[in-house]
Each structure stands twice: as C-alpha cells, then as structure tokens.
Amino acid sequence: IPILLDFYNDDNQISTVMHPILRDVAAAVGDKGKVIKINVDKNNELAEALRIKMLPTLMIYKSGEMVWRQSGEQDADTLINLIKEFI
C-alpha cells in the first residue's frame, strides 16, 4: 500500500491550503493507499532525519522505500495519479 506523507506546520500558509486537498486525495484512494499528515513542530527529529527544509514536503513510500518526494503545493489530481501508479 502506498503511503503519502505530508510534512507541514500550522504557521505555513501553503500547508494550510493543502489540508482539504489531502482530504480529497485520501477519499479518492480509499483503502488502496494512506495519507498521513506529520506536524514538523511536534516531530522535529523525524523532520531533521528526512532533511525537511521546505513546507509542505510530500513523500510517497511503498514497501518501506521512498518512491517520490516533492516540496510545495500540489493539486489533488496529480497526487491521486501518483499514488495510483504505486498501487
């Protein structure tokens, strides 16, 4: 199952804009994928380990391997299609 990780914080305007987009993505992929939001302020060590420099940063993991990574705003259709590639 592909997992989309969204690294964000509440002070970042683009991160806030992404919240409803990620809800749409989660609804579209259903049980064939997962969307997990990670607040970098509460998970600082993880953010540092993954070298999160820009918010939001989105990653897709499949079978424990990172298969895609992008920083900045993405639209729902792009994210849905990316996740479907890894189903």
Predicted regions, residues:
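Short pre-active-site segment immediately N-terminal to redox-active cysteine/selenocysteine motifs
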Residues: I1, Y8-D11, M54
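Conserved phosphotransfer microenvironments
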Residues: S15-T16
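Non-catalytic, surface beta->alpha helical segment in thiol-disulfide oxidoreductase systems
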Residues: M54, I60-I87
